[in-house]
Amino acid sequence: MKLSNMTAFLSLLIFILLVAIEARNLVGVERVELPNPASMVTAYWQKMLPHSPMPTAILELLNPPTDVNQGVHGNGYDQVYGNGYDGGYINGYSHSYSNGYSNGYFHKANLHFLEDALKPGSIITPYITGIATRAPFLRRDIADSIPVSTKNFADILAMFSPISLVMADGIQSALDTCEHHRPIKGEERACATSIESVVEFAMSVLGTRDLRAFSPDVPPEGIMPGNMYKVVAVRTVAGLRGDTVTCHTMRFPFAVFYCHAINPTRVYAVVLESEEDGSGSGSGTPEKMEALAVCHLDTSRFDPKTPLFVEHNLRPGDASVCHFVSRDSVIWAPVAAVITHGDEQVSIAE
């Protein structure tokens, strides 16, 4: 481990220990159990979104693996998937979305590509981040009673104790992002702590209750740059109106989504086939997968130092910027904007 990383780790450890001592002295803070009201979430979804099958990103939170809750308390799961490859839009969000795209997320090399790359036969090296966590939903009344604020950090540690260091780091970063996010002009965003608040935000931004939700069929651990894939097929999922909302899970003891919209956008379902020898079962590199690519069409307010712009000698506004989304992401689009192909809707991970 590098000295700088070791110093940062020790600083975090000392900070967590101090907060833990403070949390022990808190009066009136009750420990929160992690109920998983799957039937309530399902009933709400069917009532509010009768035209949208539940996407995998939501389904997998209804019946999370048993080691997820253990991971919250330090038994591995968040160690495997929670680091998000050290700095994508999983590891803290405060390094990713919170600074108007001036660094972090939009400065990750290989993360972005031009829309022209999405042509059958093209060879690309996709960068798809791993999932943040698979923490269960809380009932809305319980979730709403927990202020998403940095000053509430010690309370949250006490409510969900014991908490692993990785999870504590995720909580701190999520709270900081939700409280101090600095969006680019025109961006709409929210931290949603229940299924109801996720759906309500999407409906509010898109101006309709008639929505469809999509998630990609990609590995939970993501795909690191360097693995070559051929673009086998491309289908436009949403783009008739150009407005979508994207929600990503954040590392937290219960399901918390970072939802935002930087419109106009186009969304593509992209079938990718590995060009690597030995890919497939047991290799960690899937032979074939169906990903979701989001293309931001108006990049005039993006940072000119975005690696994609620098690499292609482009200025903000010269071209659209595309990126793939992780397995735990949900993309929302008005039903009227969803592209149909023949008599069938696209089937990607609904």
From Swiss-Prot:
Pfam family, one: BURP
Domain called BURP: residue spans: 112-335
Signal peptide feature range: 1-23
SMART domains in the record: BURP
Keyword field: Signal
Organ and tissue specificity: Expressed in roots and panicles.
Protein name: BURP domain-containing protein 10
Species of origin: Oryza sativa subsp. japonica (Rice)
